[in-house]
């Protein structure tokens, strides 16, 4: 079996135009895969220099393979099973600024550099007042980026055509706003001056983005078979699902410079990220939260099997298409396409997603993901959404414990205050008290949900039905 490097595998040389902070699985299977497709299908013609954002990382492994690796996409695409391997050749080199700080800073001197992309985890975009301008390098990611920008500003004497377009991918709502704010803090801390601040404001753009792709990472279970198939000893294979979405809150001039649409990619440049964030929370996370207890109490353990089930599958379809979708303010066709993609993701034959892994903290999840939809639906339709109400009753029933219809013991696990509350309420033996007590828990909901017209009676009725008929018969009753 051959080693994987530029001697054994073709690697196209392209101009270095992108600095990427982060070398982990997500960026390599998402951003670098997107750039690979843009290079293949458009005239983008760019390569990436990877910068390791912390002292210990993977740049040595990357450089050992001349930054070549494969992405293994697995899942359903329009109902067809896909299991593909693609060699990604877009990373030209990988730097560790803790041992190669001069080379890192020289990136700012390359006139053709245009983009900065990052994923330094949710904790990465943070201000550390201990960072100094002459640190080699600053410990925080925004500190390193400010050092780089300031060096570029000085190198090109404030030339506004040498600004950079910055796309953070960290999982923080409005991540671009947070990063920009943190850079301003460093400009002030280090007294870099009003002229530099103005150059940063006018020549550079920091744009909020929303990323979405499940990336399980290195395929330990399948790696021997993958290497055999490739005939390369690739130790950086990264597995990912087919679905990908990158929403970038930026004007069309930026989209023209980053022509992902011409490569047929699901990259959207939009005036506001907020509705897409809401869409993801409502149509991806929201269904997960109610599907899991309904499936579990029906004797189903895996998300895919729940979606395939003749009764529970119809339930989740109803919740998504008839209830939650009705509460969002985006074009209907766009929402329908997104919901269909979500169902394909839930049905991924390569992922056994245990419903119990989703059920931890179910009440707070319901409060952020499903309760807003329940309220909007009631306001717009004048009635409660039966699927979302049943999902809430299923969560409450799960916390009762006991035994499932198939004989499996139900062992709920959550924060002690939730467990204690539900234990006390179920000990009364009265579903009216259980419904009222849960809905009245302002520590969970931030309000008394008994004030929502009809909700207490609807939850009680579902609790009674689940106790008397079982979960599946109760689900059938609302379809």
Swiss-Prot record:
SUPFAM superfamilies: 6-phosphogluconate dehydrogenase C-terminal domain-like, NAD(P)-binding Rossmann-fold domains. Its EC number is 1.1.1.58. NAD(+) binds at residues 18-29. One of its GO terms (molecular function) is tagaturonate reductase activity. InterPro entries: 6-PGluconate_DH-like_C_sf, 6PGD_dom2, Altronate_OxRdtase, Mannitol_DH_C, Mannitol_DH_N, NAD(P)-bd_dom_sf. One of its GO terms (biological process) is mannitol catabolic process. The keyword Oxidoreductase applies. Keywords: NAD, Oxidoreductase. It catalyses: D-altronate + NAD(+) = keto-D-tagaturonate + NADH + H(+). One of its GO terms (cellular component) is cytosol. Signal peptide: none annotated. It comes from the Bacteria. Disulfide bonds: none annotated. The keyword 4Fe-4S does not apply. Belongs to the mannitol dehydrogenase family. UxaB subfamily. This is Altronate oxidoreductase. It comes from Phocaeicola vulgatus (strain ATCC 8482 / DSM 1447 / JCM 5826 / CCUG 4940 / NBRC 14291 / NCTC 11154) (Bacteroides vulgatus).
């Amino acid at each position: 079996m051959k080693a994987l490097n530029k001697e054994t595998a073709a690697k196209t040389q392209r101009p270095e135009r992108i600095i990427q902070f982060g070398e982990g699985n997500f960026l390599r299977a998402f951003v670098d895969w997107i750039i690979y497709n843009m290079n293949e299908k458009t005239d983008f013609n760019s390569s990436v220099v990877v910068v390791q954002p912390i002292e210990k990382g993977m740049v040595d492994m990357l450089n050992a393979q001349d930054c070549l690796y494969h992405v293994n996409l697995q899942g359903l695409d329009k109902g067809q099973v896909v299991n593909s391997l693609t060699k990604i050749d877009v990373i030209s080199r990988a730097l560790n600024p803790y041992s190669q700080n001069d080379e890192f800073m020289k990136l700012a001197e390359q006139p053709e550099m245009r983009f900065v992309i990052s994923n330094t985890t949710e904790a990465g975009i943070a201000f550390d007042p201990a960072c100094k301008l002459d640190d080699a390098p600053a410990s925080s990611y925004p500190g390193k980026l400010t050092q780089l920008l300031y060096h570029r500003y000085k190198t090109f004497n404030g030339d506004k055509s040498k600004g950079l377009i910055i796309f953070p991918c960290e999982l923080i709502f409005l991540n671009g706003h947070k990063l920009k704010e943190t850079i301003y803090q460093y400009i002030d801390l280090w007294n870099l001056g009003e002229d530099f601040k103005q150059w940063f404001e006018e020549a550079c753009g920091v744009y909020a983005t929303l990323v979405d792709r499940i990336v399980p990472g290195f395929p330990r279970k399948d790696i021997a078979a993958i290497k055999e198939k490739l005939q390369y000893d690739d130790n950086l294979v990264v597995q990912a699902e087919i679905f990908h979405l990158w929403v970038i809150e930026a004007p069309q001039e930026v989209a023209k410079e980053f022509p992902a649409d011409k490569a047929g990619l699901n990259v959207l440049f939009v005036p506001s990220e907020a509705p897409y964030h809401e869409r993801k929370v409502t149509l991806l996370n929201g269904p997960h939260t109610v599907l899991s207890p309904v499936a579990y109490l029906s004797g189903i353990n895996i998300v895919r099997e729940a979606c395939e089930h003749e009764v529970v599958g119809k339930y989740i379809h109803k919740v998504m298409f008839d209830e939650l979708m009705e509460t969002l303010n985006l074009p209907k066709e766009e929402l329908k396409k997104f919901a269909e993609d979500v169902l394909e993701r839930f049905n991924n034959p390569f992922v056994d997603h245990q419903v119990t892994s989703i059920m931890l903290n179910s009440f707070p999840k319901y409060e952020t993901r499903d309760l807003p939809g329940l309220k909007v639906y009631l306001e717009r339709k004048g009635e409660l959404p039966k699927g979302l109400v049943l999902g809430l009753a299923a969560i409450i029933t799960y916390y009762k414990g006991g035994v499932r219809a198939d004989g499996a013991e139900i062992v709920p696990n959550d924060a002690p205050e939730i467990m204690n509350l539900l234990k006390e309420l179920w000990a009364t033996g009265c579903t009216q008290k259980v419904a009222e007590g849960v809905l009245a828990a302002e520590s969970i909901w931030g309000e008394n949900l008994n004030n929502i017209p009809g909700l207490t009676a609807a939850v009680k009725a579902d609790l009674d039905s689940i106790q008397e008929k079982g979960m599946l018969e109760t689900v059938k009753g609302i379809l």
